[in-house]
């Protein structure tokens, strides 16, 4: 199975479908620039620089691809609707993958991207898995930087605010044949975003969900493809009806019956506990076994923790291993479960108060009146210090 999963990570697979090098970028600026939105009214994913709150336009970055011509020159044009043939393969077979990124403003008013090369590399891996064309990452990054520079006035110069970027690649081939697309479109849109926790962090409750399953061995759970997301909406609504804010996606082992933790909603999951075997404090997250999305925030938390916590007086060990629900329940009952939190681009860090698992409610270490534990707060602080340019770091 390892060979099956690892083959999608081979750089050669990504490079194989480079059809041309990018030549140039054409910029057509809008003649009716959109007014800046009220930062208090920003809604994640709904406040776009081209559509909100009026019908004036700003910009979209687009690159087209065909099997005969390869990648076209990049274009930044006034924001407008896409034009797709009703037979476009994306509409029938979900030939689409995407990324979530953010641009920030540093104390000097400069726009900053956080580890964009990691997002573009992941987008290429997703594209290769879906038989979509891959691209030269350095070229797209250059165009993306120019797009952000053009839209940077939409980045609120306020703590916790940013400009959310959505690079999307989709197959546009007008064919209902189930085959490799002969044409595709890569585009980027931007959405101003307020502080996810405008009134301070708020811990959530998760609903442990064994069925339906979000991802399985040999599937596409490790790729950011559109088909992974629509099927999660009904289970999320069911979790909300049961009093939880998100699902905790489980993967059950048929032989042992053990239920393994994978992701929390659309976030990677982290656990802070005292190990039952060593008595040491650990920061644990499930490994990248093909069912877990390799989140950029996840990777950054692991790197920061290893850089600043391991070997420190804190005595925390950073561990990537499978976690079972039985272990979580036992750690909570024995007072060893100190914190649980999710991590992702949109939310950065999201503390978890409890997990509903069957007829059990597993307490995740927070005291009454406490909305976040020390590790959650520390990781959020460290990440945002780098993202907003408040400290020197190689990721800059």
UniProtKB/Swiss-Prot annotation:
Organism domain of life: Eukaryota
Cofactor: pyridoxal 5'-phosphate
GO biological processes: L-leucine biosynthetic process; L-valine biosynthetic process
CDD domains found in the cross-reference section: BCAT_beta_family
Entry's induction text: Expression is positively regulated by the aspercryptin cluser-specific transcription factor atnN.
Keywords: Amino-acid biosynthesis, Aminotransferase, Branched-chain amino acid biosynthesis, Pyridoxal phosphate, Transferase
An example molecular function term from Gene Ontology annotations: branched-chain-amino-acid transaminase activity
UniProt pathway: Secondary metabolite biosynthesis
Role this protein plays: Branched-chain-amino-acid aminotransferase; part of the gene cluster that mediates the biosynthesis of aspercryptins, linear lipopeptides built from six amino acids including 2 highly unusual and nonproteogenic amino acids, 2-amino-octanoic acid (2aoa) and 2-amino-dodecanol (2adol). The core structure of aspercryptins is as follows: Ser/Ala-Thr-Ile/Val-2aoa-Asn-2adol. The first step of aspercryptin biosynthesis is the generation of the fatty acid precursors, octanoic and dodecanoic acids, by the FAS subunits atnF and atnM.
Protein's recorded name: Branched-chain-amino-acid aminotransferase atnH
Record organism: Emericella nidulans (strain FGSC A4 / ATCC 38163 / CBS 112.46 / NRRL 194 / M139)
Taxonomic path: Eukaryota, Fungi, Dikarya, Ascomycota, Pezizomycotina
